[in-house]
Amino acid sequence: MSVLLPVRDAAPWLPSALASLARQTLADHEVIAVDDGSRDGSGEILERAARRDPRLVVRHTPGHGLPAALSLALSLARAPWVARQDADDVSHRMRLARQLEWLGAHPDANVLGTRLRLFPANATGAGMKRWAAWHNSLLTHDSMRRELLIDSPLAHGTMMARRSVLEDVGGWHERGWAEDLDLWMRLFTRGARFAKLPDVLYGWRQHRTSATRTDPRYSRERFMSLKSEALRSGLLRGGRKATLIGVGASLSRWHEMLGSRIERRMELRRPHTGAVPSLEPPLVLAVMAPVARERWRAALCGCGLRELSDFVFVA
């Protein structure tokens, strides 16, 4: 088992991350840490830890970015299975063992995540709590695939994947947007099978300097650019034009993003009555609330439409 640990300026939290990996019950693992241009002493913390634990391999780079750091770590991995961890997070001591055991019992699966918890509570906002509840509700391949244009359905740090599958799609790409969702989309397109353990085996630390909050690659605009490209190469490939359905600002943003690919725009009334008008696919539904998505999903499938072939949800 090879664990990929990219690091940049994580000194306050790195010792906890390393300790959580060192105490894994799966002793036969290696941690490949890439210090990507840290200026806060993270590199020195890694070197000291490597002298104590030969399972820790350290490389230093001048700051090429997260996708490059992950690609370097992947190239150094020796095991057929690789896992991810972020330098400011922690893994449950049974995490690697349970994921590897599950994958051994399910040879058709290629990518496996886990449920997670957010900590500390006083740094966790309402939006992240909603996201975590949504993430933890998606356990199957099909549920993650159908929500792929909502947000990343599998937290990057929880990933364990077959190394060869990652290599087959070229690993992580630098395209100026979320590298994890970009990777998931390419893996789903190539037929990789996803799953998620129902156990909470990963702790995602919340703090004001986390990349999720500060890195522009995770901005709403960049996410929408990635999703719109996926739509153009997926549901709307070949120049297909869609009916766009939604409410308010979200509807307007998606209309602007998809432009000429939108043939008709339909704004929903609030509250939505549940009645479904006669609609011709393809349909793009900018519906933010999970409960509303479920109502629309049931109604459209009840009309004989197929999700991902005739309609998709976006956010």
Stretches with model-predicted labels:
Residues 1-20:
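N-proximal low-complexity "stem/linker" segments adjacent to membrane-targeting elements
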Residues 19-28:
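Short, acidic, metal-binding catalytic loop of nucleotide-sugar glycosyltransferases
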Residues 35-44, 86:
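A conserved acidic beta->alpha catalytic loop
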Residues 41, 89-102:
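Acidic donor-binding/catalytic loop of UDP-sugar-dependent glycosyltransferases
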Residues 53, 66-71, 100-102, 106-165:
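Flexible acidic/His/Gly-enriched loops in nucleotide-sugar-dependent glycosyltransferase catalytic domains
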Residues 82:
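Short aromatic/hydrophobic "clamp" motif used to bind/position activated sugar donors
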Residues 92, 114, 138-215:
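Conserved nucleotide-sugar donor-binding catalytic segment
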Residues 199-200, 204-207, 213-238:
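Catalytic core of nucleotide-sugar-dependent glycosyltransferases
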